């Protein structure tokens, strides 16, 4: 089935690529795709195209990669050229998903039917850059996707529709990301079909209550603070998979990445950070409240391993201690 609605798409990572694929596969015209410039990645630090760019190129869609869309700052000429290109490209609506660039009012005003954003939280909770990570880290029982009509604020636009999903005890950012990407793809196609049919989408202003912000995840957050409750640390490990991973550093300076852990309510005998039990079922570490059983670990230069395999090639012993990060 083909559609007459013309959609400019702006996005960068896998989350956005799922939406672009759904829009294109549903038969909507996509005259232009915006994505961030290629970035160095991998061990060789070679320039790599974004997942959105790869999809666009594989399907013959035009791609633009401006470093900015703002006429002020480091790239005014590039921004001006990109804005001219947007104006010159016949389209009806713009869809934005994890694009990574700020869209000024000048850009938001170009599409006749506005700009729709696919955001990975139940707004107004977790506005900002890392909503999936922060929802898991906070222990939220559910999260979801919100479609909103974009304005110049940070995820402050009126809400068009939402899809909810429970956060399970086993969910990591990786698993929840994939589920939400599919939910977002389905939701945006439904919205575009409705927009094509009626020429407008009903939208509800976000409530003033319940606003929280999902700050970007930094590598400095990876170190586990064993003075915290075990339940909090278990959520942190899940939230930081696949990036940046939980990190525990032994007193000799050896850093171990932690990829799976289970909180135990029983208080371990030992100061926070002390290994109190080592077995094929897990490495138990004392915490401020309860204890954390580590079940998937990775040594420097190695790969993720179940604890049984990890212990076969690494010596961890009862009484060893992990460092406590400095508190601010």
Curated annotation (Swiss-Prot):
EC class (word): transferase
Annotated catalysed reactions: L-methionyl-tRNA(fMet) + (6R)-10-formyltetrahydrofolate = N-formyl-L-methionyl-tRNA(fMet) + (6S)-5,6,7,8-tetrahydrofolate + H(+)
Hydrolase keyword on record: no
Database matches in Pfam families: Formyl_trans_C, Formyl_trans_N
Superkingdom of this protein's organism: Bacteria
InterPro entries on file: Fmt (IPR005794), Formyl_trans_C (IPR005793), Formyl_trans_C_sf (IPR037022), Formyl_transf_N (IPR002376), Formyl_transf_N_sf (IPR036477), Formyl_transferase-like_C_sf (IPR011034), GART_AS (IPR001555), Met-tRNA-FMT_C (IPR044135)
An example molecular function term from Gene Ontology annotations: methionyl-tRNA formyltransferase activity
Sequence similarity: Belongs to the Fmt family.
Protein's name according to its UniProt entry: Methionyl-tRNA formyltransferase
